[in-house]
Each structure stands twice: as structure tokens, then as C-alpha cells.
Regions:
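Glycine-/small-residue-enriched transmembrane alpha-helix faces in small-molecule transporters
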Residues: 1-37, 140-167, 186-192, 254
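Hydrophobic/small/kink-forming positions within alpha-helical transmembrane segments
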Residues: 14-17, 21, 48, 72-76, ...
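Specific transmembrane alpha-helical segments of multi-pass solute transporters/efflux pumps
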Residues: 15, 19-20, 51-98, 134, ...
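Hydrophobic/aromatic residues within transmembrane alpha-helices
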Residues: 26, 35, 39, 85, ...
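Transmembrane alpha-helices of multi-pass small-molecule transport proteins
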Residues: 29-77, 104-105, 127, 157-164, ...
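Helix-helix packing/entry segments at the starts of transmembrane helices
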Residues: 38, 94-100, 165-186, 220-257
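C-terminal transmembrane-helix exit sites in multi-pass transporters
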Residues: 46-55, 101-126, 247-268
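Hydrophobic transmembrane alpha-helices of multi-pass small-molecule transport proteins
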Residues: 47, 68, 117-137, 155-156, ...
Length: 286
């Protein structure tokens, strides 16, 4: 069981980490929001296939609006903000900002569900936000990279998705059902950009189409399935969630290998503060 948890968890974070540099590759021929539509559509198709094989249940009609809220936050809103943000960021910087999402989720959950956060947890949260400020202000107040603002927005909307996931889970839906129906709803909401997406798809090279299919099928579909499986085998949730800390490191390495990106000193300093804060928060803060 331990080996299964390790293997499935690592596979999930590896796939998620690869989405940062490969989104930048896909953006060489796709614009941000049409890319989001195509990625969500590919992911929805793959999740429907996985769901069929796993015999997932259909959602109740009265819950469909909740799936639209969930998909609107976690996939429509996330794709728009994430894809726009990463245009002007390195894979490393983007992945570090997104890594703050669990802390944002814990803050919201502490208010909604009255979950206690210890004083050391609040100290870790404060330190993480200092790390974000270092990233934002490293080049000076007047040269804040707008991509960072968009990516903080992506972390916030994904936090909203996490809270919705929890609500749907309490209603009896399992992880695969939640991500499948949320992804379908997210793709439908991105349908306004279907025309642009299909037009760009028709003119794209084979290598960029492969990058697009990879993004949809693996980080957006398979990784959620393997993450859910890892959770089901784990004795404690933290056995799985602690793997999230590896994502920025992996995406930095992949960004260097695939795109020859070299992060600036601000990314290393701010990033180190953020990652240490997240580790402390998860180990001691709750």
C-alpha cells in the first residue's frame, strides 16, 4: 500500500509540474483562453472514459448548478487566469505561486468550517505571503509583473474550487465524480472560445497539438484520477498532500530542460520562504 501511495502521488505531482512548461510550449501556437477551452475539452473526454470504466454515478439534477460553480472556479476561471499569468512568468515562479493554494484553502476553511489554525500556522501563513511579496516586488514597485497578479488570481479561484469540492464530497460524490462533472461544466463555460480554439487547432503543428493533448489527458485528467486513488490507499491524507511540495522543484527543473529558463534570485529567495512556510504549515500549523 505504501508503495502504491508513493507511486500514485509522485505520478500526480510529476504530471501537474509538467503542465507549467508545457503550457508555455502550447502557447507558442495557441492563445490563452482558447487553449484553456481545448485543454478542458480533452480532459473532459478523458475523464468521461475513465468515469465509464469506473462506473461513476450521474449527478442529481438539483446539484448540476453546483458543478457549474465548481467547474467555473476550478477550470474556467483557473484556465483563464493561469494561462494569462504564465505568459510572462517562468515555470518556477508560476508553480511557486500556485503552491500557496492549500494555505488559502485552509484560511477559508478556518472561517467556513471553524477549523482551528495554530499560532505557528498563522506565522507560516504570514511568512508565505512575505515570500509572495518578495516575488512581486523583487524588480521594484513599478515593475510588478502583471503575470504574477493573474497567477495569484488563479490560486484564489482554485482555492474556491477546493472549497466546492469539499461541499460536493459532503453530499456523497466521490473525487472522480466531482472532477469529471466539474471539468465538463468548465469546458461548457469556456465554449465561448470554441471557435477561436478550433481555428487555432486547424493551423497548429503536430508537436503543439501533442502538447495540447498531453495537457488535457495527463495533468488535467489522469493526475486527478491517480491523486484520488492515492488518497484512497493512504492511511493519512498528509501522506499524499506532502508530495505537493515537490511540484515547484520539478517544474523548475522541467522549465530549465524544456525551455532553458533560469529563475532570478527573487524566485529562489521568495520561493524558498514560501515552500518552507507551506511545509511548516502542513506539519505543525493545523
Amino acid at each position: 500500500e505504501k508503495k502504491k501511495v508513493f507511486g500514485l502521488s509522485f505520478l500526480s505531482v510529476f504530471l501537474w509540474a509538467s503542465a507549467f512548461p508545457l503550457t508555455k510550449v502550447a502557447q507558442q501556437q495557441f492563445t490563452s483562453i482558447p487553449l484553456g477551452f481545448l485543454r478542458c475539452t480533452v480532459a473532459a473526454i478523458f475523464l468521461i472514459i475513465i468515469g465509464k470504466c469506473c462506473h461513476i454515478r450521474l449527478p442529481q439534477k438539483k446539484h448540476i448548478p453546483l458543478f457549474f460553480v465548481s467547474g467555473g472556479l476550478g477550470f474556467t476561471g483557473y484556465m483563464i487566469t493561469f494561462n494569462t499569468g504564465i505568459l510572462t512568468l517562468t515555470s518556477a515562479t508560476s508553480s511557486i505561486i500556485i503552491a500557496v493554494t492549500p494555505i488559502l484553502t485552509a484560511i477559508v476553511a478556518s472561517h467556513l468550517y471553524k477549523e482551528k489554525i495554530k499560532p505557528i500556522g498563522w506565522a507560516a501563513i504570514a511568512a508565505a505571503f512575505i515570500g509572495v511579496l518578495i516575488l512581486l516586488l523583487w524588480e521594484g514597485v513599478f515593475s510588478i509583473n502583471i503575470g504574477l497578479i493573474w497567477t495569484v488570481g488563479a490560486a484564489i479561484v482554485f482555492c474556491g474550487y477546493n472549497i466546492m469540492t469539499r461541499k460536493l464530497s459532503a453530499m456523497g460524490y466521490n473525487a472522480l465524480e466531482i472532477v469529471t462533472y466539474s471539468m465538463i461544466c468548465g469546458a461548457i463555460l469556456l465554449g465561448f472560445w470554441a471557435g477561436d480554439g478550433l481555428h487555432q487547432l486547424a493551423g497548429a503543428s503536430v508537436s503543439h497539438i501533442i502538447a495540447l493533448i498531453y495537457l488535457g489527458a495527463l495533468p488535467s485528467a489522469t493526475a486527478y484520477f491517480t491523486w484520488g486513488k492515492a488518497m484512497s490507499y493512504a492511511e493519512r491524507t498528509s501522506e499524499v498532500t506532502n508530495f505537493m511540495f515537490v511540484t515547484p522543484l520539478l517544474s523548475t527543473i522541467m522549465g530549465f530542460i524544456i525551455l532553458h529558463e533560469v529563475p532570478n534570485a527573487g524566485t529562489f529567495i521568495g520561493g524558498a520562504i514560501i515552500i518552507i512556510s507551506i511545509v511548516v504549515f502542513n506539519l505543525k500549523g493545523k
